[in-house]
Amino acid sequence: MRCLGIDYGTRRIGLAYGDELGVATPLPALVEADPAKRWQSLLATARQRRVTDLVVGHPLNMDDTAGPKAKEAEAVAARLRTELAGVDVHLVDERLTSYEAEATISKTQRRAVRASGVIDSRAATLILQDFLDQRFPPPLPHPAE
């Protein structure tokens, strides 16, 4: 299993990679200004890494409803299923991952870092790690004898 985590946005696409070892690692975000080039870079990354699973963040509202951003993620997932036939595409709840990722960066650096896509890739890492943790739960400790 080779997974690509995706935090899809209209300006940047955060990426992360993980496999059966169960550890998600951030990749450089796609920050091209042209959305078509950004999309092509996403497809190229998936092909180069020969991913078997794409894990797309699904930003549901706090009340579990799907707002405009969630519907956009659903459309992205559908497009990926079409353009990368044979690759499994999963939608994973990503509520608060961007907030959590941003919280790891000092307030004075957030504005500069945001444009680089670092926050987006950290969010993608959190999304993918959640998926991997569900697939490969950590082993239970052995009881002391």
From Swiss-Prot:
Which GO terms fall under biological process for this protein? Answer: rRNA 5'-end processing
Q: Does the keyword Magnesium apply?
A: no
Localization (cell): Cytoplasm
**EC number(s) on file:** 3.1.-.-
Q: Which GO terms describe its molecular function?
A: nuclease activity
Q: Which GO terms describe its cellular component?
A: cytosol
Chief subcellular location equals: cytoplasm
Which keywords does this Swiss-Prot/TrEMBL entry list? Cytoplasm, Hydrolase, Nuclease, Ribosome biogenesis
Q: Does the keyword Nuclease apply?
A: yes
Q: Name one Pfam family in it.
A: RuvX
Q: Which InterPro entries match?
A: RNaseH-like_sf (IPR012337), YqgF (IPR005227), YqgF/RNaseH-like_dom (IPR006641), YqgF/RNaseH-like_dom_sf (IPR037027)
Q: To which protein family does this belong?
A: Belongs to the YqgF nuclease family.
Q: What does this protein do?
A: Could be a nuclease involved in processing of the 5'-end of pre-16S rRNA.
> Any idea what this protein is called?
Putative pre-16S rRNA nuclease
